[in-house]
Amino acid sequence: QEQGTNPSQEQNVPLPRNYKQALETNTPTKTSWPELVGVTAEQAETKIKEEMVDVQIQVSPHDSFVTADYNPKRVRLYVDESNKVTRTPSIG
């Protein structure tokens, strides 16, 4: 080791200060998109993928039945006959 270097200073990554911060570092910052109600499915998908890159978008008719399983990488878009989002898209 060279004189004057300190290996502990090579990685200056701040640690979480509390339990809540530790949990938040692994979860998306946004879990729903109420501002997308009324836009087309394509516009909503584009906006969501800008904020959550590895998301799977599932488009369904607003009156359809879907499985009740929770998927943290999925956002469902419920659309009407004109392909406009009718419910707030959210993770699940």
Swiss-Prot record:
The keyword RNA-binding does not apply. Residues 1-12 have a biased composition (Polar residues). GO terms for biological process: response to wounding. InterPro entries: Prot_inh_pot1 (IPR000864), Prot_inh_pot1_sf (IPR036354). Residues 1-31 are annotated as: Disordered. It comes from the Eukaryota. Keywords: Protease inhibitor, Serine protease inhibitor. The record marks 68-69 as: Reactive bond. GO terms for molecular function: serine-type endopeptidase inhibitor activity. The keyword Transmembrane helix does not apply. Inhibitor of subtilisin. Belongs to the protease inhibitor I13 (potato type I serine protease inhibitor) family. PANTHER family: PROTEIN, PUTATIVE, EXPRESSED-RELATED, SUBTILISIN INHIBITOR 1. This is Subtilisin inhibitor 1. It comes from Phaseolus angularis (Azuki bean).
